[in-house]
């Protein structure tokens, strides 16, 4: 009996001393969502905006540069869409799609007479950001990217009151002011409009 107790005690000591703490199984990080085009991001933000105001209308769609998304192929990992509501006491609210999630920003005042917040009917947005890029590439973008392949590309779509049309601004650079090239493309037809810089 003593031998059995000693054997069990020795076995217990060996097990306690020699066993390593169990390591947790390596957890794979979920792969971030792929970059998407402006119209895909717009649709996701539009649903959220309609929950805020049933009459929400877009006035601007723009891509946001991130470390791992430089606007290639007309896609981005982050898009911001500005919506305005005439019935919500003339207010506006930005919505952002980033890595698969939609969030909203701070509500702000909205004036229909302000040219930078002129709302547009989404039916005019027939040309997506990747198609706008194709047009811009044919008008100087391809040559610029050959010389400077790391140049980021931004996309902005808004209503142009002077020409009364929805316009894509394909911007080769980190912002519109310091851009190396800006190309305007009709967002309804995909036609080249002009080189803005």
Would you name each region that the model predicts?
Residues 17-197:
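Long, terminal "pre-/pro-" and other extracytoplasmic accessory regions
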Residues 1-15:
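Sec-dependent bacterial lipoprotein signal peptides
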